[in-house]
UniProtKB/Swiss-Prot annotation:
Encoding gene per record: tet(50)
Cofactor(s) needed: FAD
Protein's UniProt name: Flavin-dependent monooxygenase
Binding positions (FAD): 12-15, 34-36, 44-47, 105, 267, 289, 296-302
Broad enzyme group: oxidoreductase
UniProt-listed Enzyme Commission number(s): 1.14.13.-
Coiled coil region boundaries: none
TM helices/strands, residue ranges: none
Activity control summary: Inhibited by anhydrotetracycline.
Amino acid sequence: MTKHIKILVIGVGVAGPAVAYWLKRFGFSPVLIEKSAAVRKGGQALDIRGIATHIAKEMGIYDQICNMRTQIKCGRYVDVKGNVLHEEQGETFGFRQDDEVEILRGDLVEILMKAIADIPCEFKQSVIKIEQNEDSVTVTYKDGRVENYDLVIAADGIHSATRGMVFSKNEYQLINLGSYVSAFTIPNYLGLDHMELLCESNHKLVTLQSDSQADKAMAGFMFRSKHVLEDIRDEQEQKHFLHASFQNFGWETQNILNRMPESDDFYFDAITQIKMKSWTKGRIALIGDAAYCPSPLSGQGNNLAFVGAYILAGELKKADGDYIQAFTRYNELLHPFVEANQQFGVWVSESFLLKDDEVSKEIAEARSNKILAMIKSVSNSINLPQYE
């Protein structure tokens, strides 16, 4: 019986709670752990697109997502002197169509966690050792506790500690696409009203948006650089690098950076893809960015997480808990979808951060039209199996 199959899910981002939801719905017994003290508030804006929209509706959370969406009404391109070059309707500016929705990462995770309120979840917990044999997986926690599970599913992000413990370095690749991304919340000092501003020039891009939280604004930075940080996880090194990279950029950039110390949700990372021939090893599976991050610029990581969660849990149900059969199908079914979205991620990375002094209306419209067409294609480039 599947209800006796105990599954540890590592990570409370999008993929972790999503796969826990489907595991419980399909009759398994998942438990969640998360190294942070609580669900992180705010964060980057994420899109629910294509097939992922259908999955959100099946989960009964789509209406809640719509109620908490960002509601950006207008997007404006500005030059480094602050002159408005042109503007677009909010959904077009964000490359969204039909019933696709944008929501802050923290709000989406909060919705997902409410949907799995009956599933045990332990915060401030992490794994320091994983051992497996033919019968089970033995997990040693940082507090010294040792537990046995039938399966482990790791959804602990692009810098997955689980991936490093379970897979050898020749079994995965971190492919740096040559750019960096940063985001953090600051006071809405410009008084933006459901608006996003974007300034792009000389391989760099700065955005500022404010939506339903009128007193706050989300700042975003993307830029190309060949410089490699000594420690990509060192926040002080990240902030120094960001300051140095944008010190002469113009527009509102210095005003935004001067407010960076006020932020409590600073995010910074290299724009990277994860590539693996197999996302499973024995009784352990990777999911979401830990397995197949398509790059933050693609806007597709959220959708890969939703689809991957549904298929992994569904194949375990279909195989009646036979993890070897289920994991094989998970790899087979999802790889073409992942490859299409990762190829799109590379293309987006190359089409943004232009060397031009400014992005003309013609360039922006041509790029927008191509992105809309490509997103619609890659977001729906899989036929979802039915498991119920």
